[in-house]
């Protein structure tokens, strides 16, 4: 499944910016907080859309989507 997440802002406890697409085998729902790989290392992301059709992903990125690591720990 492909989902869209917005990333946690550096040093803050809120999420924003443009959505990024990730692949996952996890059963996610909108609002879940997950651990995502980014160019700067791991970060938390908030799921804003699930079941994104592959056709909606820019063809340049379809074969290189990163995968969500896991659910974020609670707390």
Task: Give the ranges of each region predicted by the language model.
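Terminal, basic amphipathic appendages of nucleotide-handling enzymes
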Residues: 2-75
């Amino acid at each position: 499944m492909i989902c869209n997440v917005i990333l946690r802002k550096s040093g803050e406890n809120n999420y924003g910016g443009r959505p990024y697409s990730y692949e996952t085998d996890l059963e996610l729902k909108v609002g879940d907080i997950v651990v995502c790989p980014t160019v700067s290392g791991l970060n938390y992301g908030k799921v804003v859309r699930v079941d994104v059709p592959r056709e909606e992903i820019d063809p340049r990125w379809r074969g290189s989507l990163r995968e969500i690591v896991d659910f974020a720990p609670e707390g």
